[in-house]
Amino acid sequence: MMHRLCLLGTLLALLISSPTSAADTPGYKQKHAEMLYTVVLVRPSNGSGSGTVIWSEPDRAGEYHSLILTNHHVVRQAIKIEAAWDPKLGKKVDREKRNLVRAEWHVYNDYSHMVGSKSSRAEIVAYDAKLDLALLRLIDRERRVTPVAYFLPEDEPIYMFDEVTAVGAGLGEPPFATQGNLAFMDKIIEGENYFLSSAPIIFGNSGGALFRYSPERKRYELIGVPSKVSAAGWQAVSHMTWSIPIDTVRDFLRGNCYHPVVKEPLDRELCASWGELKASGK
């Protein structure tokens, strides 16, 4: 009889015990902080895409400059060429106009349940249509944005079969993660280098992030920007996705005088207008 009572007590204890919180599970907090929370939903006037927070530091005046990396094709419709009258030339000339876009973050409870979102306007401060990259800067200068994605260190190799995680706002949904492996390297598409992964993405993931975990540094690092989905006829092949390598991202940032983002001093000889580049903090 006593044995039965003990067994019944054990079963009751199991039934009424509180479930383990996701926050108590090893790795949940790190995955959210270093991957999910660094990726935002980017909303131009039409459509949507993804972006990754790569920098948020103050300048000498104490204003924060927060930068979001995305694809050019995500914000392409916000860049317009309009004819405007030039009084000095006495004629109409084509001038570029860049409309603001919105960046949207999502807030989670217990690392699982979305409880809300927040957004901020952002300006397009740089882009390269050929590389299909663009850089956004938040209008809000009062607050630091955290967390910020880690970059894969320069010259560190990546290999086929490396496990990777793609994070993006597919179909305009809040950013979510998919897993896969690096599958093919050094694919030239429209003259630029891409690599293939099997982490599924879909329309709206463009401009997001592809991460790989570093056992050495014990952190998730940005290795590429998911940009293209393979297709067979009109059918998207979502598990064959092409990403822009992080080395191309570095070249893009350097070429637009954002050297501090890649942990380098500003090249003042190359960037004659370095004093106007607020994001340098110099």
Language model regions located:
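Short, solvent-exposed loop/turn segments that connect beta-strands within catalytic domains
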Residues: 57-65, 112-115, 189-191, 214-221, ...
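Active-site-proximal beta-strands of protease catalytic cores
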Residues: 38-39, 65-71, 157-171, 197, ...
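Bacterial N-terminal signal peptides
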Residues: 6-17
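Positively charged n-region of N-terminal signal peptides that target proteins for export
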Residues: 1-5
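N-terminal activation segment of mature serine protease catalytic domains
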Residues: 22-63, 67-71, 78-80, 132-133, ...
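C-terminal cap/linker of serine protease catalytic domains
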Residues: 24-30, 79-110, 222-282
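Conserved active-site neighborhood of the chymotrypsin/trypsin-like protease fold
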Residues: 48, 61-84, 99-160, 164-167, ...
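Conserved hydrophobic positions within beta-strands
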Residues: 51-53, 122-124, 182
